[in-house]
Amino acid sequence: MDVRSRRSTKSGPAEPIKALKKAHHNEESPKASDALPLPLYVTNVVFFTLFFSVVYFLLTRWREKIRTSTPLHVLTFSEISAVFALIASFIYLLGFFGIDFVQSLILRPTTDVWAADDEEEEQESILIKDDTRKVPCGAALECPLPQIAPPVVVSSKSALPKVIDTVPATTEEDEEIIKSVLDGKTPSYSLETKLGDCHRAASIRREALQRLTGKSLSGLPLNGFDYDSILGQCCEMPVGYVQIPVGIAGPLLLDGREYCVPMATTEGCLVASTNRGCKAIHLSGGSFSVLLKDGITRAPVVRFNTARRAADLKFFLEEPNNFETLTMVFNRSSRFARLQTIKCTIAGKNLYMRFCCTTGDAMGMNMISKGVQNVLDFLQNDFPDMDVIGISGNFCSDKKPAAVNWIEGRGKSVVCEATIKGEVVRKVLKTNVEALVELNMLKNLTGSAMAGALGGFNAHASNIVSAVFIATGQDPAQNVESSHCITMMEPVNDGKDLHVSVTMPSIEVGTVGGGTQLASQSACLNLLGVKGANREVAGSNARMLATIVAGAVLAGELSLMSALAAGQLVNSHMKYNRSNKNLTTPTP
């Protein structure tokens, strides 16, 4: 059998044996100081003291001779004695410390010792084998070592055992912490604070989880990730990270510039289809976008004793003179937050106030929440009977399909359009203008209306939005309202060419904060040229990212609709989006 083994960097079972044998060999080798009659420390102290004392005496005498112009070769009896004492002490010290060094060069270990070491290393390499037991790592430590079977010759490489990377064995200190977590003495969420090492905390938490559940996490990577970067910002109590492949669609020609669009997805055909749409747009002269609106929203809900008092606050907020004062209060929360509007609606004695503001290059939910809190504190001076029920009353509306977002917009409202040449429709998209226009009307418009869709008048906008969001560090949950889209297709130029557009009223994106600061997501933003905050024009990077999302959606809509019109959808998905793996193997 083809045995593949890795040298362990940890102390294995064979290392103590080797250490004992080497120690035994060293004990048999005679030392130069073994036969000294006096204790070593006594003789060493005497000769060290003699050596430095004589050196000091001679230097002092020679300095006096130089001052008095006495020849140096004229020596007194005391100086002659000092020279002999210096030579004697130097010979002793050289002999004592030099013989051990010479012995280490001359008296090498015998070949028998090295042969024994090689034999131990060979046994150690056999013991280091892949741990394929279906038990947690901690339980595996308590299990006896398996019997080593004799090697078996196999004729096929497919019969070789699969090599699985194992997690390094925990130290005694880590073992105590793991047991403390399992016993409930140490909260799992406090490991980062107590240890001061985020990677070590994740490793200990992971091992404790495996022992607690009895399930292996061998397929979930642990190493290769900066856990310090997510502390207190992106994720709590991490035990690893999930790998999602990132593909590139493009170049997307948008507003005269080319963009390579990163898409993180596990759906086959998605990147390829979007890439085909980008090609069709590029060959037709590119696409063009318009930013219609920019403003994130937050809508707190407050309650009064009567509906009349709720209406009084509504009228107060809608008064232009009062709005200027509220704007000053709101804008104090951040140098980027700028209040735009406050729209109110009443439900009985409850009032919902929908604040809308710009937030620079950040998506802005935290920023607007601070500004809203400032305004609520200010309003309670004039309306002390106002009871703040919640800073979010779902009139925002965040991460939920809502008509208010579809009509009023939330985040960035963008429309993107392109005119596709008839020749490109036929040669690249493999269909014709008439078929696309008819399919779009019956599917995206009539079909969605029959389904009672809210913002879903499109083929698959959420596919592209989700893929770009994950790749660039956006909030994937905000794909709900960010994917609101209506796709329009009309014949132009006497029916020869196709005008296609997507209108997306609530794209919620940012280029700073949240997941955008992670290394992988930051690299994807850098690829698009929108990494971080724009120092020249605040918010321009986030607005550009929103237009890129809309442009990618336009390409994806164009390609999928063409595949449907040409009857290619099933064939392409069977070719690129079908798994051939055996899914019947049980998971431990």
Curated annotation (Swiss-Prot):
Mainly expressed in roots and leaves and, to a lower extent, in trichomes, flowers and stems. One of its GO terms (biological process) is coenzyme A metabolic process. It is an enzyme of class 1 (oxidoreductase). Glycans are attached at N331, N444, N577, N582. It is found in: Endoplasmic reticulum membrane; Plastid, Chloroplast membrane; Peroxisome membrane. The active site is at E267, K399, D475, H573. Keywords: Chloroplast, Endoplasmic reticulum, Glycoprotein, Isoprene biosynthesis, Membrane, NADP, Oxidoreductase, Peroxisome, Plastid, Transmembrane, Transmembrane helix. Its EC number is 1.1.1.34. It catalyses: (R)-mevalonate + 2 NADP(+) + CoA = (3S)-3-hydroxy-3-methylglutaryl-CoA + 2 NADPH + 2 H(+). It is a multi-pass membrane protein. Pathway: Metabolic intermediate biosynthesis; (R)-mevalonate biosynthesis; (R)-mevalonate from acetyl-CoA: step 3/3. The chain crosses the membrane at residues 38-58, 82-102, 544-564. One of its GO terms (cellular component) is endoplasmic reticulum membrane. One of its GO terms (molecular function) is hydroxymethylglutaryl-CoA reductase (NADPH) activity. It comes from the Eukaryota. Belongs to the HMG-CoA reductase family. This is 3-hydroxy-3-methylglutaryl coenzyme A reductase. It comes from Cannabis sativa. The lineage of its organism: Eukaryota, Viridiplantae, Streptophyta, Embryophyta, Tracheophyta. The gene is HMGR2.
